[in-house]
Amino acid sequence: RRLLRDLNIEINQIIPEGGSVKDLKNLPKAWFNLIPYREVGLMTAMYLNKEYGMPYISTAPMGAVDMAEWIRQIQKNVNTLALSLSSKRVDYEPYIDGQTRFV
């Protein structure tokens, strides 16, 4: 959560944590899904991708290299989806550099 906050990304839902059946209606509102653990949530993400065209990221952000790749995938999804709303793009490379510089 902290990392997403650092990137100014608002979390729509965390499923199953604290979720209820009535919260499920909000799932299609997300721009994309993050699946930090492939064992949990991958089938749901695949379903949402099939039904709603919602992309998902299933790279586990464990270690500096995977975390950097995870953030780059987030950046790619945000920039792709933001094109329809604005010409503004995000660049998370300075954040990645700051987080991985001394590793």
From Swiss-Prot:
This is Light-independent protochlorophyllide reductase subunit B. Component of the dark-operative protochlorophyllide reductase (DPOR) that uses Mg-ATP and reduced ferredoxin to reduce ring D of protochlorophyllide (Pchlide) to form chlorophyllide a (Chlide). This reaction is light-independent. The NB-protein (ChlN-ChlB) is the catalytic component of the complex. It is found in: Plastid, Chloroplast. Binds 1 [4Fe-4S] cluster per heterodimer. The cluster is bound at the heterodimer interface by residues from both subunits. Protochlorophyllide reductase is composed of three subunits; ChlL, ChlN and ChlB. Forms a heterotetramer of two ChlB and two ChlN subunits. One of its GO terms (cellular component) is chloroplast. GO terms for biological process: light-independent chlorophyll biosynthetic process; photosynthesis. It comes from the Eukaryota. Belongs to the ChlB/BchB/BchZ family. It catalyses: chlorophyllide a + oxidized 2[4Fe-4S]-[ferredoxin] + 2 ADP + 2 phosphate = protochlorophyllide a + reduced 2[4Fe-4S]-[ferredoxin] + 2 ATP + 2 H2O. Pathway: Porphyrin-containing compound metabolism; chlorophyll biosynthesis (light-independent). Its EC number is 1.3.7.7. Keywords: 4Fe-4S, ATP-binding, Chlorophyll biosynthesis, Chloroplast, Iron, Iron-sulfur, Metal-binding, Nucleotide-binding, Oxidoreductase, Photosynthesis, Plastid. It comes from Metasequoia glyptostroboides (Dawn redwood). PANTHER family: LIGHT-INDEPENDENT PROTOCHLOROPHYLLIDE REDUCTASE SUBUNIT B (PTHR33712:SF7). GO terms for molecular function: 4 iron, 4 sulfur cluster binding; ATP binding; metal ion binding; oxidoreductase activity. Pfam families: Oxidored_nitro (PF00148). Its cofactor is [4Fe-4S] cluster.
